[in-house]
């Protein structure tokens, strides 16, 4: 007698993955949702937290912006990943993340809202980061 095993993989929601990248991309939550706890890139998203704490302890006289810069860079990477995930076509998304789920993705307006919010906040954070960094590097922080 032969038995066949049916592997059931949970369906991964593209809008939810993008929302996680938008809200918690700093901590790599979207990576853990998609790939599980063994994802190395997800754990790399957590590395800036102890790095920022170490900078705060080792360089207490440094400007606060330098101390949180690793966190900002991780957040910007999370925003970028949220955009990449959300803009992936549904058929490619299903082939990569939902091959064994037995369901097809059908994204709608919630994903569009997440993508617009991600682009707005991500662009704003990037511009503010560049402005503050250039201010600190070229004027020593004279403008703030």
What is each model feature region?
Residues 31-45:
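Alpha-helical transmembrane segments of integral membrane proteins, especially early/N-terminal helices
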Residues 2-18, 43-144:
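Transmembrane helix recognition focused on a "late"/terminal membrane span
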Residues 20-31:
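N-terminal signal-anchor/start-transfer transmembrane helix
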């Amino acid at each position: 007698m032969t038995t066949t095993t049916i592997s059931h993989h949970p369906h991964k929601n593209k809008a939810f993955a993008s929302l996680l990248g938008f809200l918690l991309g700093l901590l790599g939550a979207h990576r853990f949702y998609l790939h599980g706890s063994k994802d190395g890139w997800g754990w790399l998203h957590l590395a800036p937290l102890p790095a920022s704490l170490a900078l705060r302890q080792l360089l207490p006289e440094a400007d606060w912006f330098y101390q949180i810069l690793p966190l900002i860079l991780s957040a910007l990477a999370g925003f970028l990943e949220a955009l990449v995930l959300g803009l992936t076509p549904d058929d490619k998304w299903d082939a990569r993340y939902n091959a064994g789920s037995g369901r097809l993705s059908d994204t709608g307006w919630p994903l569009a809202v997440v993508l617009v919010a991600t682009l707005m906040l991500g662009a704003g954070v990037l511009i503010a980061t560049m402005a503050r960094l250039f201010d600190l590097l070229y004027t020593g922080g004279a403008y703030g």
